[in-house]
Each structure stands twice: as structure tokens, then as C-alpha cells.
């Protein structure tokens, strides 16, 4: 398992690097171990066989005890300090047939040893004085505990291995035969501590025959190992486990000399020593301390040997796993070969099946072709019989079509004759249309001349209106001046002169009124002529449309001809042409009628808009009335035929009667102080004598006149609608 070996070598190399970093970097022993690890990693890098991560994980889970779930940093914080921190030194222990312990085992073992060291320090502190050697060792253990909390677990593992090597100070090589040089490091540390506590350097203490150990205390190295290996290994992660020395070791810890007052002896190990020998007491204390250290190192060595046995067992399990992996790979290779042979066999079988399928498809296609040819022959026989029957039917239809062709030929000749007749009628209608167009153009010219005449008349009327208005204003001003003058110069004796002057004034007013009425008569006669001309034009247009309509009805009436039944079946294009022409003529006549109505309405609106300032003197109430009557007569003439137009004209009231009514209204609106009574006669117009009235009567009369004129206008508008 190359990955596990590389990780083990990486852990060992980290231990060495951290020891060099936190310990003595110039130690030649550590440098030699590092170089040996590098050489061993480069020489044994190709050993081992790969295994899957699942197998290695399963093997490690089955061999490692249940440990705590907390993961300590494995020295990654020091990976960037050295370039060769990840060098391949994974086979360093493999050269000596050993492997490093796993991370969980090393962690549990370090926790156990730290707890054991703390218990030993506390026990020594209770036996010795506070200022003696035990206090110094307790301080050392406390400093080690702080350092373990500050450093990583890999540094603790390296310290553990160094302490194991220091336990055998007289043996040049440890039990693992891996790194004998590491034992000098901790021995130097012990010598330094002894030099601190004991300044003078002396040789080894002499042998004292009177200080003999008890038989229970003198245990050989193999017996101590046997005592540890006969027991089951303790749970390293348990917090309730406490390690106490065995019962035969109790006299060793309790054999310290008991100090007595001066002049008495000291009992040590069952022997009496003079109390005044100070050097002897120091040697006894040093001997006891060294014994305790040897015992602690022996225990540590036993623990390390048990850890090495556990590592050996793990390596054996790993070898077993590698063998199983090799067997599994061989089995997989065998199965792969079998599967490849099976795939080849299936390919051959598939090829045979494909060939058989192609042969079957070809046979089936041949059978289908034969069946199709048989069905096609049967269908051809049936089609031949159908064709024979169809041929007989077509021969009968051919004979029938020949007879109908002769009939169609006769009809064509009749249609040609009808076409010639229609063309002749079309030429006649075109000539008539040209004549009517010339007549329409003549009417349009007359209408334009009439419009010019009306414009000239309107200009003249406007001029006369302005002149009359100015003269009336001057007359009013002169009359007012004359009346004021007469009022100022009037006296009670001149009543007759005033009456004569008033009569003369009334006479002049009546003469002016007569002149105004004569001017109105002349103007209304002119307007009547214009309206009659417009009505005549409308009547002519309506008569033309009615005559054309009558002609169309006569031409399209049914005739008793030999080909009448045939003509009814076939619609003639000439008939459509004639209908379109008639429709065009009717629309043109309606257009002319509407033009005439529009012109009359425009004239009336212009007259109404041109005379707003004369409303007080003489409101033009008669103009809309005449225009409305003329428009109504024109509308009636346009909407009916020629006979209807004549009837409508006869039904209208006589023109002199209308003029009399209009003149009466005009005369009643011209004078503010008089109320004339107009009587319309067929031949003449009589004007009654005026009577003086008040302003209220004149206003009521004007209101009545306005209401009557508005009612007449409403009636005319309803007639037009």
C-alpha cells in the first residue's frame, strides 16, 4: 500500500524536522537520521503494491481501536518551512521491517503517557521536599504539558520515541533496532538536569553491600516486560484509566531515608546509617531518584514495545490485505478474460442471426413481389372491363352532344342577330347621350350666367342698402333737429302752425313709405324672376330625367318575339349597358337638383348675413320666405315627374298673393311709430293710413311679425326635409 507507506514516511520526516526546529538544530545525530531516512526513501521507493482506498480504510478501521473523534493538526503548519518536507521517506521503517503507528494510536498513546508523567510527578512531589529534586521534575513535567498543548501531535510522537531510546542508556541499540542514535538526546537532557541540581561532578557511587534490594523489588527486564504483556492493552482514549505501580514496587517508592534529629541513626531499607553523614544522605537521595527514573523509563519502554508489537500486527494485516488484493486482481483478470470470450461468442452469434435475418427478408420481399404482381394483374382485368363500359357510355354522350351542338349553333346565330340589334340601339343611345350632354353643358352655362347676375344684383342691393341707411339716418337727425327747434320756439298761440307742420311731416313720411314700398316691389320682382328661372331649370332637369326613365321602361318592356324564351335564359350585355347608362343619367339629374338647392340656400344665407344692421329699421323677413317657397317648389319639382311638377306648381299659392304678404310684413317693420294694415289683393297692394301709437305697441307688433315669419320658415324647412 503505497499511500499508507508514503504517509508514514511523511509523518516520520515531519517528526525529524520538528525536532530539529524546536530542539537542537545542530545535533549531528538528528542530521544523520534525516540523511538516512532520505537515502532509505530513495532506495526503497518502488516497494509495495497499490490497493484501493476502500480496502485500506476497512483494514485501518478493523485494526485501530475506537478513539476520540477530534482531529489534531498533523504538522501541516510546518510544511512550508522546508523544501523536502514531503520527500519520499516512507520506506525508512520498512528497511527495518517496521512501520509507524497510525494517527489515532499515536494520539491515544501520547495522551496516556502525558497523564502517566503527570501522575509520577505528583507522587514524587508528595514524597520529596518542595525545593528538592522532585519539585524540579514536577516543573519539568508541567513545562512538558504546556509544550504538548502548544505543539502538534507529531512532536509528541517524536519525544515519545526519544524517551524510549533513553530508557536503555547502556544498550547501544533499542528493541526495534531502528534508530539507536536517538537515545543520546534524552541522556544529554538528564545530564544537564543533574548538573543543574548537583554542581560538582563525581564518579559513579560505590557499591554498598549493606543496601540490598528486597527480593520483591528486584525484577528483571524480561519479567517487567512479561508483566506488561500478560495484561491486555489499556484503552488509550479512556479518561478513567489510572496507572499505579504494582504491589511489589511499593517498598521501592517508600524506601526513602527518614531524617531524625542529630545524634540518631537513619533507617534506610532495613539498615541503619549514621545521621551525621551528609554525603551519604545525598547519595541515597540521588540513588533513589535514579531508581525512580529507571522505573519510569522501563515502563515507557514496555509501552513502546507493546506499541511496536501493535504496529507489527498492523503490518502483518496489511500484508494479508495485499495478498487478498492480489488474489482479487487475479480473479478480476480471469473474469475479464471470461467476459471478453463471452462477448466474442455473442458477436459471432449476432453476426449469424443478422445473416439469417437478411436471408429471411430477401425471401419475404420475393414473396411480396409475386403477390403484388398477381394483384396488379387482377386489377388490370377489372380496369379493362370498366374501360369498356365507359367507352359505351361515352359513345352515347357523343351522339347526344352532336345533337345539342346543332341546337347551340342555331342559338348562336340568334345571339348574333340580337347582338347586331343591340349594337344599333347602343349607337342610337350614344347619340342621344351626346345631345343630352350638350343640353347639360348649356344649362351649366346658363347657371353660371345666372350666378353672375345674382352676384351683380347683390352688389347693387348692398349699395342701395347702404345709401338708404345713410339717408334714413340723415333724415332722422334732421327731423330731430327740426322737432327740437319747433319745441323751443313753440307758444300757446301757434297751435295751428304746429298741427299743420305735423300733418306735413306725416305726409312726407307716407310718401317716403310709398317710395320704399315701390323699391321693395321692384326688388322682389327681380328676385321672383331669378327664382322662377332657377325653378324652370330644375323642372327641365326633372322632366329630362322622367322622360329618360319612361324611355328606359318602354325599351325594357317584354316583347312578343320568336326568340323571347331564348333571350330570357341568356342575359344580354347590352341590357346591362343600358341599365348603367340610365343609372348614370338618374344620378346626374339628382346631382343637378342638389346643386340648385345648394345655390338657393347659399344665396339666402348670404342675404341673411349681409343685413343684420337693418333689423331695427326693416328686418329682411321676406327674403327667406320667398327663397324657402321657391326652394320648396324646386324640391317638389325635382322629386316627381313632369306631370307631378306641373301639379306641384299649380298647387302653390299665386305669386302676387305671396308678394302682398311679404310687402305687408316689410312695411310693418320699417316704421317704429306706425302700424300699417296690409291687405293683399291679386292685382294691387293697398296701403292704409297710419295711426300714431306708442313704443310698446310697435314692439309687440314686431314680436308678432317675428313669430309669424319664424313659423313660416319652420314650415318651409319641414317641407324641404
From Swiss-Prot:
A motif (PDZ-binding) lies at residues 718-721. It is found in: Recycling endosome; Cytoplasm; Cell projection, Podosome; Cell junction. Expressed in endothelial cells. Induction: Up-regulated by fgf17 and fgf8. Keywords: Cell junction, Cell projection, Coiled coil, Cytoplasm, Endosome, Phosphoprotein, Wnt signaling pathway. GO terms for cellular component: bicellular tight junction; cell cortex; cell junction; cell projection; cell-cell junction; cytoplasmic vesicle; plasma membrane; podosome. Interacts with SRC. Belongs to the angiomotin family. PANTHER family: ANGIOMOTIN (PTHR14826), ANGIOMOTIN-LIKE PROTEIN 2 (PTHR14826:SF3). Required for proper architecture of actin filaments and for cell movements during embryogenesis. Plays a role in the radial actin fiber architecture in skin epithelial cells, thereby maintains cell geometry, size and cell interconnectivity within the skin. Plays an important role in coupling actin fibers to cell junctions in endothelial cells and is therefore required for correct endothelial cell morphology and maintenance of dorsal aorta lumen expansion during embryogenesis. This is Angiomotin-like 2a. It comes from Danio rerio (Zebrafish). The gene is amotl2a.
